[in-house]
Structure formats: C-alpha cells, structure tokens
Curated annotation (Swiss-Prot):
Gene from which the chain derives: OFUT23
GO CC entries: Golgi membrane
Transmembrane helix in keyword set: yes
Alphabetical list of PANTHER family matching this protein: O-FUCOSYLTRANSFERASE 23
Keyword annotations: Carbohydrate metabolism, Fucose metabolism, Glycoprotein, Glycosyltransferase, Golgi apparatus, Membrane, Signal-anchor, Transferase, Transmembrane, Transmembrane helix
The name this protein goes by in its record: O-fucosyltransferase 23
Result of changing H54N: Complements the mutant reduced seed set phenotype
Keyword check for Cell inner membrane: no
Subcellular localization, as worded in the UniProt entry: Golgi apparatus membrane
Segments crossing the lipid bilayer: 12-34
Glycosylated residue positions: N97, N179, N294, N424
Pathway(s) the chain acts in: Glycan metabolism
One Pfam family cited in the UniProt record for this chain: O-FucT
Binding-site list for substrate: H258, M259, R260, T374, F375
Biological classification of the source: Eukaryota, Viridiplantae, Streptophyta, Embryophyta, Tracheophyta
Amino acid sequence: MNSPLSSKNLRIFSKSVACKCLVLVGIALFYRALLLSYSPRNALSNSLLFRDRHMSDSSSTGGIRTDKFLEVPQIVWGLNNQKIAFARACLTARMMNRTLLMPSLSASLFYKEVDKLRPIPFDKVFQFERFNSLCSGFVRLSRFSDVKNRAQVFDLEKGSGRRWTVERDLEHLKQSARNESIDEFEVIRLIGKNPFLWHDHWPVEDYAKVFECMVVVDEISREADKVVMKIREAGEAERAKLASKTEILGPVPFVAVHMRIEIDWMIHCKKLEQRKKISEICSSKREILDRVGNISGLKTPTVLYLAVADTLLEEKEEDSSVLSGWRDGLIPFEKKKLGVKEEIYGKYSYLIQSAIDYEVCLRADVFVGNSFSTFSSLIVLERTQKARRLGFMSSCKDGGNKWRSYAYNLAGESNGVPRRWMTNMTHSSLQAISYGSNSVSCSSG
C-alpha cells in the first residue's frame, strides 16, 4: 500500500512534469512564430503591411507618398533587362511606400558602343506623364526638382555577389522599410553594383502592371509605324505580283521572327545548354525555317519581318543569308532589304533601335521568338496581356486570337511546328522571362 506521503510526492511530480511540458510547448510555438515571421514568403507581406500603415498620409497620391522618395543608380544592360530592372526599382519603391525619382537608362550595352555608353533620361524613351496616369495608385515617378531638400538623403547600400541571396536581399529591404529613423529621410538613395538586375521578389502580374504603364514616346512610336508601313507595302507589292493566285482578301499579314542565330548568341546558348543539361535553347537556321513554315493558318502571301542582329545583315553568301531558304508564299524582309536600316534605325543609339524593333514585333499579326530570349519573352508577355483583355486566356487552338505567339526553339504538337506560347500570369516570379524556360505553354494560367 502506498503511503500518503508518496502519493503527495507523485502528484507534485506529475504537476512538475506537466508544467515543464507546457513550458517546452510554449517555447516551441514562440520559435515557430519567430521563424515564420522571417520567412521569405512573409517578409514581403510584412513590408506591405508597413507600407499600408502610411496609406493615410496626407502627402500621398492614391496611397503612394509624394513627399518621400527613392533614388536608384543608372540602369544598365540591354533594353529589355533595363525594363525589368526599372520595374523592380518601381516595385521596391512601392514596397517602401515611396515615389521613385526618375532614373537614367543607358543608351547602349556596356560591352558594345562604349563611346555611346551615356545616361539617357527615362522620359526620352517612355512617356513620363502617361506612366503616372496609367500606374496611378500602384507606383509613381517624380522628377528630382520635386525634392525639397537634396541634403536630406540616406544612402542605403544593396549588396551583390553570390552571398547576397534573394532572401537576404528581401530581408534587407524589409528591415529598411520598417526602420523609422531611415524612413524620416526625404530621400533614400540605393547604392550598389546594378542593384536591380538580379534579385526578384514579385509575381509576374506586378511586373506586367508596370510594363503596361511604359508607353514609348511619340518619336519612337512614329518610327515603328514607318517600319510597319514599309512591311505592309512590301506585302501589297507581293500580292500584286500574284494577282489571282492570292487567297487573302484583307491586308497581307506579317509575321515577326526574332531570329537568334548570330555567333555570340550561339556561343552563349551552347554553354547554357551544357549548364542546364537541356537541348532546346539553340535553334539552327534550318530548324527556324522549317518550324515557322509549318505554322497553321498562314495565308499566301505572308510577309516575314526578321528581327536579327546587324552582323547577320552583312552575309555575302546567299546560302548563309537569313533571307534564303524560306518556303514558297513566305516573303522575308529585314531592316536592310526594307530600306530602313540607315534611314530609320541608323539615326539612333542601340537602346532606341531595340525599342523600335520591339514595337514592330509587338504589332505583328503573329510573333515567333526564342523562349530563352528576354526580348522575345517580354514581347510575348505584352501580347498575352492584350489577348487576355480580348477574352483569350489560351492559344491552344486556332481561332480569333489576333495576338498569337510561338517559340521556335520548342517543338509544338509535333516536331515540325513551333510551340504555341503565352506567358503564365500566375507565376510567383519573373524567372521564366528573365532567364528563359523550356516549360512554356499555350495557356496564360
């Protein structure tokens, strides 16, 4: 029989064990909550909560503060990576609930035309007022003249290199956004080596909103109109030659092909294939000719506009020319054959030339590109947005979708046709557009 004393000790011991268990459970829950609060997924939402706390600020337009600014370094690289970097700068400013001070872009790639590597104001390429009108309440741009006190600037250094991971970059931005002593400064100036080229914290839809607000200036739009008019005129001339043989009643359609077969691209894509252990990045001229020629629904004649590197325009031998080898009914033109290489493109820097070519390809009846090209991917993103506004969520079947796009480096329903291509708007990052993908499909999500 147990003594009363031993029963009492047992009860005390049981209570002690229960208390210890409760304490351990409490500690575990505390650390779990702490870890979750610092996870990458919640880091951005916490920063957005910080931004929302300032929504009632009297000095704001549609929730974006107009008396607090973010300044960023000159944006570099090619047109399309500059567009992405600019969008990231806008979204960073949005996360910190600040107005972005209008940044400078770069007139050319830094490894090409070194003598022309000079800053070019954003509003020399894209419409400033139109940007703010279209993006009202989402992101906002200001001119440096709007800053009251240029001496009140806080320099916020953004890291780079392999150790500066995506998670570390986001945590750094989040902590800076929550730091009230930093937020007191009228201007936060981000410094670092090309701080917006690499790290990505936002979904495709957020980037798409910014891109939609980036409307090129009238001068670039007019130059693109001239090129498109030349293409249409070439189509009409071909129709006149065919007379009764043509099956087209309306305007002769044109297909824009972003043809990446220049030497530096082929070297790059071969290395990329080796690194990624895939074989669907590079395409030979023959593969492009065959797959474009097998696109369903192309009428006779159809004009092809070949958006190619200038080095490919100088080929002397007919067999190696980008203009040779196309099937009957497809009439190829490039800048030189159209007569616009010097007359239009030659007047401008590399950046503006790219912007004109982008607009021309965007306006095509059909676009065909490479899914590992940023240029091609951004055009398909914008064409996807236009198609969705017309009610086309996919392009899996032939129909009334006037914004069809294809990836010639990927096989479609069979090896002989290119894959139908729409941007997946549900992706949580811009990875597939920034770095390319072989997982593209005919659905926008």
